[in-house]
Amino acid sequence: MKLIVKVFPEITIKSRPVRKQFIRQLGKNIRAVLRDLDPELRVTGVWDNLEVETDLDDPKLLAEMTERLRNTPGIGLFLEVNEYPLGDLDAITEHCKRHYADQLPGKIFAVRCKRGGKHPFSSIDVERHVGSRLRQECNAAGIDLKKPEVEVRMEIRDQRLFVVHNRHEGLGGYPLGSLEQTLVLMSGGFDSTVAAYQMMRRGLVSHFCFFNLGGRAHELGVMEVAHYIWQKFGRSQRVLFISVPFEEVVGEILGKVDNSQMGVILKRMMLRAATRVAERLEIEALVTGEAISQVSSQTLTNLAVIDSATDMLVMRPLIASHKQDIIDTATQIGTAEFAKNMPEYCGVISVNPTTKARGYRIEREEAQFDMAILERALERATQLPIDRVIDELGKDVQVEEVREALAGQIVIDIRHPDAAEDEPLDVPGVEVQTLPFYALNNKFKELDENRQYLLYCDKGVMSRLHAHHLLSEGHANVRVYRPA
């Protein structure tokens, strides 16, 4: 398979050195994203377009390559092509006919040609000649340049002809690694996951910072969704997941801060801690998922007071977004189901939260707060590469594993729905249910407690983690299914 990758249009208007730098970075990212599928992958070109070639012919692997490229920042679109020596107009027609003859009978079509280089014909000459012959020789219904049912596409570069047989839209944005880095404050809900996606889509490498308010299940859920976002949109770069234990901070706020000021002060403590983390990692900006007036702490007045806790730039990509638009984006990128099933821990709930915080009042309340507690939280923070976070979590978890499922037991396939659909799990003589890992904790209590359940995933890590959590919650009827 050969692909022609067209870069994000904004890259093409950069100065020559910057343009070359961005396109070179995109080439590196494409190699990194596809290397595990094809170590022999070839990526060439440094100016207008990149050419990607693979000798693989497995349809599943090729489909996975296509999906990964669609989600790689920096790509405007890419084309699946077949390359031929140019030849004359009749030769061009024959190559197009080979690929499009089966699609044209009874159809209205148009021919589109893009051309670069010196030739004895123009792009319009090619379109007219090829269109006329295909209409006559392929039993097409006619030609319509405005609303064709089929488009015959080709590109000509010097003495090379590329017949296009598939076109895929890319993510746009700049290549990850070509711009600065950010630290995203992650709660795992709709807003923070979409905010992270927006920054990555634009081309900013985004690390993840989670403030654990006291729920182990919540921490696990946020790790899972952060790993998902990175794997789908940012896998070309190494990023970190930082978890800061904030239970003591919450306790101090509950014990010493006026109820109406709790939410604003908690956000200020998070910004202080995130700033320290970012400075240590030499990251230049923080990112949150806040939108104007979505909740009481997000009025303009409150946001200004919250931001005064740090000198670092705080970016809010969703600031003017409607909630439904955010949910729609989360659905599109695959994080909505994570958010819907995310365990929550609300330790700071104001009965009458202020919508107009005043700086002097906040300073007075914070004077009661023991800042040594915030320092302890930062000292106890954990930091892991995002690609190892799930493995590290499961490393010391001990759960009974079984190699064989028996009649009467139920195997629960907890893989992501895409993986379960691509390769359905079949265990002869045993019932198999599909329940994605992100919904497992909420849905498990609805299952028959008199049955025994075996959790299954590809590597056994996610199933061990969730089995361990369910056992700690008092569900004794859980094991891990690891077929030989």
From Swiss-Prot:
SMART domains xref list: THUMP
Domain of life assignment: Bacteria
Predominant localisation class: cytoplasm
Residues in Rhodanese domain copies: 405-483
Keyword ATP-binding on entry: yes
GO molecular function: ATP binding; CCA tRNA nucleotidyltransferase activity; tRNA binding; tRNA-uracil-4 sulfurtransferase activity
UniProt pathway: Cofactor biosynthesis; thiamine diphosphate biosynthesis
Disulfide pairings: C346-C457
Subcellular location(s) per record: Cytoplasm
Active site per the UniProt annotation: C457 (cysteine persulfide intermediate)
CDD domains from the UniProt entry: PPase_ThiI (cd01712), THUMP_ThiI (cd11716)
Catalytic activity of the protein: [ThiI sulfur-carrier protein]-S-sulfanyl-L-cysteine + a uridine in tRNA + 2 reduced [2Fe-2S]-[ferredoxin] + ATP + H(+) = [ThiI sulfur-carrier protein]-L-cysteine + a 4-thiouridine in tRNA + 2 oxidized [2Fe-2S]-[ferredoxin] + AMP + diphosphate; [ThiS sulfur-carrier protein]-C-terminal Gly-Gly-AMP + S-sulfanyl-L-cysteinyl-[cysteine desulfurase] + AH2 = [ThiS sulfur-carrier protein]-C-terminal-Gly-aminoethanethioate + L-cysteinyl-[cysteine desulfurase] + A + AMP + 2 H(+)
All residue ranges annotated as the THUMP domain in the record: 63-167
Binding site for ATP: L185, M186, K267, G289, Q298
EC id: 2.8.1.4
EC class (word): transferase
GO cellular component entries: cytosol
Disulfide bond is among the record's keywords: yes
Classification via InterPro entries: Rhodanese-like_dom (IPR001763), Rhodanese-like_dom_sf (IPR036873), Rossmann-like_a/b/a_fold (IPR014729), ThiI_AANH (IPR020536), ThiI_fer (IPR054173), ThiI_N (IPR049961), THII_Thiazole_biosynth_dom (IPR026340), THUMP_dom (IPR004114)
GO biological process, one term: thiamine diphosphate biosynthetic process
Keyword annotations from UniProtKB, A to Z: ATP-binding, Cytoplasm, Disulfide bond, Nucleotide-binding, Redox-active center, RNA-binding, Thiamine biosynthesis, Transferase, tRNA-binding
Function: Catalyzes the ATP-dependent transfer of a sulfur to tRNA to produce 4-thiouridine in position 8 of tRNAs, which functions as a near-UV photosensor. Also catalyzes the transfer of sulfur to the sulfur carrier protein ThiS, forming ThiS-thiocarboxylate. This is a step in the synthesis of thiazole, in the thiamine biosynthesis pathway. The sulfur is donated as persulfide by IscS.
HAMAP family in the cross-refs: ThiI
Family classification: Belongs to the ThiI family.
This protein's name: tRNA sulfurtransferase
